[in-house]
């Protein structure tokens, strides 16, 4: 995927339920579905996505980014997919490996690419690799829970202590997400081989790497190079959630700020632009400090990037408040249209979060589960079916 594409981000459990028979797998730890609980599984699956590929194609989508589909056999919160318990297996509540291959094939037949979400920084605590470690050094802090500081800016901070960097990179994301030690050559090989296997097996077109700066820099650089050496046209985007373009640019391939080190990561996520867009369209452009001037001022700083066209740009995603936040604050259709026009025409690779096109609203202050509400019409007997054009806003 590249700047000629429009990525559409889908959380599979919340998009559409095409096969109710796989909603509950009795032998899995979270064996229930409750659509009234935003933190529970809701039953969306790969079949539901495949059934609605024509809808996506008609929107103009050219690439689909799926939140993790690999097995997440965790006791709770397994719907989001970010605590993998088997790197080689699709979660059975979403479908099978064969069904994923079929989805990719069908997407390709309609001119759409498929981007797979992967997580090398951590796995789920129910992963067999953690429950029966090949050796203690497969996980950081010898498998003992030690919380990360989340301060990944320390990686490039010239004033940071070694301890600050270690606790940020080696610390665990949460207690249920043990931190993999990518410096262990066996761990590195396992992760690299698993990603290449999915490329070969399923024919995916790209990878989005979660929590990219939290993993070991050198191993992740080796991985990016290994993949793109084998597949020169393949793209990887790393989640680089940092609050300035200078910090984000450090992680892009051939960054002058990282030299002589090189991440070999072609595409990074432009979180700072997301913040600027969420402010700019709420302000009047009356002086040199606010409104649309924010965007102009920010884009004039693109010289810090090695390749500004390889930035993933977005208004929101599954971890942030939706741009269409709430009725009191930001539900202004003119603001919304302006922002979407800017998103789709600025430099970089535009990404749209599912439901953007039907004005789905959510505030992160009310919990992450509500950022990931069910798409109306994805379940039988939904009172409104937005996959049907007649039920959408003219």
Regions found by a protein language model. Name each.
Residues 1-5, 13-202, 220-230, 246-247, ...:
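Substrate-binding/active-site clefts of carbohydrate-active enzymes
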Residues 1-9, 16-17, 25-27, 44-62, ...:
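Carbohydrate-interacting/catalytic domains
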Residues 6-8, 64-66, 114-116, 207, ...:
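Hydrophobic faces of well-ordered beta-strands that scaffold small-molecule active sites
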Residues 11-14, 70, 91-94, 120, ...:
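Short, flexible loop/turn elements at secondary-structure junctions
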Residues 48-51, 98-102, 190, 214-222, ...:
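Generic recognition of stable, solvent-exposed alpha-helical segments in well-folded globular domains
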Residues 108, 122, 127-130, 194-196, ...:
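Active-site-proximal helices and loops of the catalytic beta/alpha 8
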Residues 176, 305-331:
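Active-site clefts of carbohydrate-active enzymes
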């Amino acid at each position: 995927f590249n700047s000629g594409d429009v990525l559409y981000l889908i959380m599979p459990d919340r998009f559409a339920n095409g096969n109710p028979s796989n909603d509950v797998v009795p032998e899995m730890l979270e064996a229930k579905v409750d659509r009234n609980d935003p933190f529970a599984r809701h039953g969306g699956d790969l079949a539901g996505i495949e059934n609605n590929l024509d809808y996506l194609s008609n929107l103009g989508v050219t690439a689909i980014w799926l939140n993790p589909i690999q097995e997440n056999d965790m006791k709770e919160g397994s719907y989001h997919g970010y605590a993998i318990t088997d790197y080689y297996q699709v979660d059975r509540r979403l479908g099978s490996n064969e069904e994923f291959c079929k989805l990719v094939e069908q997407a390709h037949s309609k001119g759409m690419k498929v981007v797979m979400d992967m997580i090398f920084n951590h796995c789920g605590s129910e992963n067999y690799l953690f429950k029966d470690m090949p050796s203690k050094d497969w996980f950081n802090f010898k498998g003992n829970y030690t919380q990360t500081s989340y301060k990944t800016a320390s990686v490039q901070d010239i004033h940071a202590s070694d301890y600050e960097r270690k606790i940020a990179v080696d610390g665990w994301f949460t207690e249920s997400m043990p931190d993999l030690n990518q410096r262990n050559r066996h761990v590195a090989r396992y992760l690299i081989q698993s990603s290449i296997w999915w490329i070969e097996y399923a024919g995916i077109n790209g990878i989005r790497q979660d929590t990219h700066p939290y993993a070991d820099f050198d191993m992740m650089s080796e991985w990016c190079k290994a993949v793109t050496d084998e597949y020169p046209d393949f793209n990887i985007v790393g989640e680089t959630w940092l609050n300035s373009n200078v910090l984000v640019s450090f992680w892009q391939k051939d960054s002058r700020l990282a030299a002589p080190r090189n991440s070999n990561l072609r595409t990074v996520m432009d979180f700072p632009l997301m913040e600027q867009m969420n402010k700019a369209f709420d302000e009047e452009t009356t002086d040199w400090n606010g409104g649309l001037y924010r965007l102009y001022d920010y884009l004039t700083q693109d010289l810090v990037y090695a390749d500004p066209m390889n930035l993933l740009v977005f208004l929101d995603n599954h971890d942030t408040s939706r741009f269409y936040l709430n009725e009191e604050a930001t539900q202004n259709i003119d603001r919304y249209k302006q922002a979407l026009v800017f998103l789709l025409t600025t430099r970089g690779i535009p990404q749209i979060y599912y439901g953007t096109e039907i004005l789905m609203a959510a505030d992160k202050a009310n919990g992450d589960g509500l950022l990931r509400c069910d798409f109306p019409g994805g379940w039988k007997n939904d009172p409104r079916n937005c996959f049907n054009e007649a039920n959408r806003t003219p």
